[in-house]
Amino acid sequence: MNALTLPDIARQTTTADLPLDWVGMQGIALPVQIGGQRVAAEADAGVSLDDPQARGIHMSRLYLALAELEQGELDLSCLRAVLQRFLDSHAGLSRRAYLRLRLAPLLRRPALVSPLSGWKRYPLVLDTRLEGDDFQAEVHLELTYSSTCPCSAALARQLIQERFDQDFAGQPLDHASVLAWLGSSAGIVATPHSQRSSAHLRIGLAEDCIGLPLEELADLGESALGTAVQTAVKRADEQAFALANGQNLMFCEDAVRRLHRALQGYPQASRFSIRVVHAESLHAHDAVAESHWQRGAA
């Protein structure tokens, strides 16, 4: 008995006569290796459908090509190779290939003072695109930090001054008494409000960039902000964090400018956009600021 030939409906033509910008799959589970870690990722893979007579693409070919990403350390060269396989397997049908990876690798971060350290998650999206020889890669990275309101800090200082005036008016100042007062809740009657905040970085990588500079970008951004959220801490670390917040008072405008200046000096960035969100503890709404830049633009 002769085996039946399985039908390939995707090879059929259509009378619709309409090319499509993107056709593919979303949310494909995939293990990848980044920074020596095995990380669970989700992939969106697709190509353009430029032949207006073609009914569809061959999605299984895209799915199978993704297996190449499991073989070694994830970098831009292997991402480009996968995109090229997308196009090679759709010769005559597609001119553009797209791949997006969503993952959340862990970085071990040291405490500020003590020898402790702990793991911190960094939500990451990698967007890549290939058309002919034009390969583009963009990193979306989220950083979490603490922001203390400069206005609230000034108001708190004023209240402390007023209480000091009330408690010591007309009295000779004694060093020991003042020192004890400064260390008491009776003296420090107000503290500024602060909140956990987030910076969303979208960075276009330069053509000569090969590796994925996750740790470099995290270090660069957190150093610019000065108040990255911590992992394992002792009391000495918590005190150092309080000092860092006091020395890095920030409105959302201040935070986005710090990040903008830092990324402008990063040679592997060809362009970027930044969005910072301060989840206000004073208000029921967020404070937001944005900035963008492109190398060579006026």
UniProtKB/Swiss-Prot annotation:
Reactions catalysed, as given in the entry: GTP + H2O = 7,8-dihydroneopterin 3'-triphosphate + formate + H(+)
Keyword terms, alphabetized: Hydrolase
Coiled coil: none
Organism: Pseudomonas aeruginosa (strain ATCC 15692 / DSM 22644 / CIP 104116 / JCM 14847 / LMG 12228 / 1C / PRS 101 / PAO1)
UniProt record similarity statement: Belongs to the GTP cyclohydrolase IV family.
InterPro entries registered for this protein in UniProt: GTP_cyclohydrolase_FolE2 (IPR022838), GTP_cyclohydrolase_FolE2/MptA (IPR003801)
EC number: 3.5.4.16
Metabolic or biological pathway: Cofactor biosynthesis; 7,8-dihydroneopterin triphosphate biosynthesis; 7,8-dihydroneopterin triphosphate from GTP: step 1/1
Domain of life from the UniProt record: Bacteria
Catalytic EC class: hydrolase
Upper taxonomic lineage: Bacteria, Pseudomonadati, Pseudomonadota, Gammaproteobacteria, Pseudomonadales
Listed GO biological process terms: tetrahydrofolate biosynthetic process
GO molecular function, one term: GTP cyclohydrolase activity
Protein name per its UniProtKB record: GTP cyclohydrolase FolE2
HAMAP family membership: GTP_cyclohydrol_B (MF_01527_B)
